[in-house]
A protein has these predicted regions:
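NTP/phosphate- and nucleic-acid-binding module
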Residues: 1-645
């Protein structure tokens, strides 16, 4: 990762925010190449998810919204991470991300001040006392030593023994428990050093920790992996950035920077449905900034406090509605999503969930992430959010990912695809008092044709699902049963609350994954036998920041420069082009390889007609293998466009 981080700064992909003032942790700026890469990714996602589909429309919502939205979504009360602090350094940790450790825990019950003015030392005695104190850490051993010294025929040793006895009985002490974990192989003295630093910070001039006992532990997460010091008890830390709307900072004016883009989509669901002339199933997509006050931002841009999301909320019919209309629900296991034309009319939530998982993996492959670098991880039941029926995380094998028992990278999350049931729309209906259900004429007509047994069975299933949700949300039992019955009765009228499938991806994580995947090194030996390592970023042309570089062979030949500028201007309306005339042609190729530019277009003397048959042609060099071919200037744009789109 160090090489990638260095390259990103050196070539203008990513800078630390506010770097001239020391930086600010968890915030990053995108330089010229990074900004282009980011724009390309967002546009490709938007085109794939909205413009190339008839069933998805877009939304762009504000970053600050009514705080009631975050109350309804649960973010105000539950959007938190467990946080703990190192009791020695005050460094903060995510309690659930502390690395497990094995070793021996040393428990201390407090500390004495090792040197006291009450001793009344004679000259040279203080140093002798300190020498003995440092040798014997256990208080009982120290008392035993003092007793031995006090009966020594050497009067000086008698005085030292008396001074130590006086020390052990002093009242200048701290009775504050503390513990230190030592990994295997570390000497016990190291625990006393760390404990001494802890008690020194609590006002003791020269603390002498008092050990109570030790304990052998495995998989311990109660101590700082960096220094072994004890961590505080975990406590919830809300991740939302709080601010105020208007000139008065009062609780009435509290607002939050949005921690996700999804909730605005749910809040605007009815408006979009009514104005876009869509029908369920359909989706609403949004790309935008989100903010989370992470306890410990880590792994470069992977976990940041300001980031960008690409989210789709795809609204579908509940299974009971699908079954009422079509007579059955297509099992997800039987679904083959590779066909371009699919009959989705009988799809339930499992089929739609599987479809979106496979669609998203195909997207990642289409922009240059090999399938063998991706992991499809199905969350276990105990890992699911309370509202989710199923969630699949698409993981990428970053260099910093953990390794399994076989030594294989396990991957870190790029995107989650969650089947969120009807939780979100139901919550906003409850908190806003506004209906979030839809009317479906097809359902109303189909319901009237069902026999009574079928109606009763479907109504019962819908009632039980709604009752489960209402009970989980703390609605009083009698009221919950009444509301659930009313919801079930709504099926006969063609009314229901849509369910949601949510593919949610992080732009910044995807950028980092693409850079990691594209990074490669090539060792080249020159004519003098000197070997040099070059970096090539093998971006897929679709995402590459610069699509083509236009290079005149020589800078000091005006006719070459003029023709190169004409070629540049011809390509600019169609793609991002970079013009470079500085340095040897080999060095310019190397610079473009490092920037990830897939094509270099060289204007040479043959372009000008030195060889008449090659006039108005250029050399096009491909980044990954260095191969070149000759093309006419007039056909250049048409040759490049299919390769970069």
């Amino acid at each position: 990762m160090e090489k990638i981080v260095s390259l990103c700064k050196r070539r203008g992909f990513i800078y630390q925010s506010s770097e001239i003032y020391g930086g600010i942790n968890g915030f990053w700026d995108y330089g010229p190449l990074g900004a282009e890469l980011k724009r390309n990714i967002k546009e490709l996602w938007w085109n794939t998810m909205t413009r190339q589909r008839d069933d998805v429309v877009g939304l762009e919502a504000t970053i600050i919204m009514s705080p009631q939205i975050w109350k309804a979504s649960g973010h105000v009360d539950t959007f938190s991470d467990p946080m703990c602090d190192c009791r020695l350094t005050n460094k903060r940790f995510r309690a659930d991300q502390v690395e497990p450790q094995d070793g021996i825990v040393y428990y201390f019950k407090g500390a004495f001040n090792m040197v006291s003015e009450e001793f009344g030392f004679i000259e040279g005695e203080k140093e002798e006392v300190e020498k003995y104190l440092k040798q014997k850490r256990e208080i009982d051993d120290l008392k035993k030593l003092a007793e031995e010294l006090s009966v020594s025929p050497d009067q000086r040793k008698q005085k030292i023994g008396a001074a130590i006895l006086e020390f052990t009985n002093l009242k200048k002490e701290i009775k504050e428990p503390f513990s230190v974990l030592l990994p295997p192989g570390k000497p016990p003295e190291a625990a006393f050093v760390v404990a001494g630093q802890f008690y020194e910070k609590r006002g003791m001039e020269c603390p002498w920790p008092i050990k109570s006992h030790t304990e052998k532990v495995t998989g311990d997460t109660r101590h700082n992996p960096e220094n072994g010091a004890e961590l505080t008890e975990a406590r919830p830390f809300n991740l939302m950035f709080k601010t105020y709307v208007g000139p008065v900072e009062s609780e009435d004016n509290v607002a939050y920077l949005r921690p996700e883009t999804a909730q605005a989509i749910f809040a605007q669901f009815k408006n979009v449905l009514e104005t876009s002339r869509q029908k369920v199933p359909f989706g609403i997509a949004q790309v935008g900034k989100a903010f989370r006050n992470e306890v410990t931002p880590r792994n470069y841009t992977f976990r940041s406090r300001e980031f960008e999301q690409m989210e789709l909320e795809f609204f579908i019919k509940p299974d009971e509605v699908v079954e009422a209309i079509k007579g059955h629900v297509t099992p997800g296991a039987e679904l083959d999503t590779r066909h371009s034309t699919l009959d989705t009319s009988s799809w339930g939530w499992e089929a739609w969930h599987k479809y979106w998982v496979e669609e998203r993996i195909r997207f990642y492959e289409s922009i240059g992430l090999p399938r063998n670098t991706l992991v499809e991880y199905w969350q276990k039941p105990e890992e699911l959010a309370h509202y989710a029926r199923a969630t699949v995380d698409i993981l990428y094998k970053f260099p910093f990912s953990k390794r399994d028992e076989k030594g294989e990278l396990t991957g870190e999350e790029l995107e989650g695809i969650a089947a969120r049931s009807d939780f979100d729309l139901s919550q906003h209906a409850r908190f806003s008092g506004k209906p979030m259900g839809v009317f479906d004429e097809e359902l109303r007509a189909a319901w009237g044709k069902l026999d009574e047994a079928r109606k009763a069975g479907l109504s019962k299933r819908y009632y039980e699902a709604r009752l489960k949700y209402l009970t989980k949300m703390g609605v009083e039992a009698v009221k919950a049963e009444q509301e659930a019955r009313e919801d079930a009765a709504g099926l006969a009228k063609g009314q229901y609350i849509p369910h949601v499938i949510e593919p949610s991806a992080g732009v910044d994580r995807l950028i980092l994954a693409l850079i990691c995947s594209a990074y490669s090194e090539v060792a080249e030996t020159d004519d003098k036998g000197k070997t040099e390592t070059r970096v090539i970023l093998k971006f897929h042309p679709r995402v590459a920041p610069i699509k083509a570089a236009v290079l005149p062979l020589l800078k000091n030949k005006p006719e070459l420069v003029k023709k190169a500028q004409e070629v540049r201007d011809q390509l600019r309306p169609w793609m991002n082009v970079f013009y470079d005339d500085g340095g040897s042609i080999g060095r310019r190729y190397a610079r473009q390889d490092e920037a990830g530019t897939p094509f270099c277009v060289t204007i040479d003397f043959d372009t000008l007609g030195e060889k008449p048959e090659l006039k108005d042609t250029v050399t096009v060099r491909y980044r990954d293998d260095g191969k070149q071919e000759r093309l006419g200037i007039g056909e250049l744009a048409n040759w490049l466009l299919p390769k970069i789109r």
